[in-house]
Amino acid sequence: MVHLTADETALVTGLWAKVNVKEYGGEALGRLLVVYPWTQRFFEHFGDLSSASAVMHNPKVKAHGEKVLASFGDGLKHLDDLKGAFAELSALHCEKSHVDPQNFKLLGNMLVCVLSRHLGKEFSPQAQAAYEKVVAGVANALAHKYH
C-alpha cells in the first residue's frame, strides 16, 4: 500500500497519462542494464549487451522494458493493494528468475530519472516525491514473495 495525499495521487495519475510506455520503458530498462551492468545476467538471452549503445538499441531490451512499464502502469490502478497487484510477478521473479529484490529499487530509480528527463519542468519536486513513494511501494510489493 502506498499512502499518497489527494494532491500526490493527482500528480502521479496526471503525469502517467503523458508517459510513452514503449519509449520510457525501454529507456528505463536500458539504463538499468548500463548503469548496473551486473543486472545483465538476467537478460543474457537478449543478445548483444556489450556496450551502452548496444543495450539502448537492443529491440528485446526495448520490448521487455515496455512490458515492465505497462505492468507498472497497471499497478497504479491498485495503489491500495500493490502486493496483490504484483503477487504473480513477485512469485515469478523470486521462484523462477531469482532476481535480487534490490534490483526492483534500482529500476525504480531509473524510472524516476527517465520521467524527469522526458517530463522536464512538469516533473516537479512534488511529483518526484510522489513517484518516489510509488516506486518504493512497487519495489516492496515485488519483493514480497522473498520474505
From Swiss-Prot:
Domain (Globin) spans 3-147
Query: What is an annotated GO biological process for this record, any one?
Result: hydrogen peroxide catabolic process
SUPFAM superfamilies in UniProt: Globin-like
* Coiled-coil boundaries: none
Q: Which GO terms describe its cellular component?
A: blood microparticle; haptoglobin-hemoglobin complex; hemoglobin complex
Where does the record place the modification Phosphoserine?
A: S51
| Chain positions recorded as heme b binding sites | H64, H93
A single Pfam family it belongs to is: Globin
What is the similarity comment for this entry? Belongs to the globin family.
**What name goes with this protein?**
Hemoglobin subunit delta
UniProt lineage: Eukaryota, Metazoa, Chordata, Craniata, Vertebrata
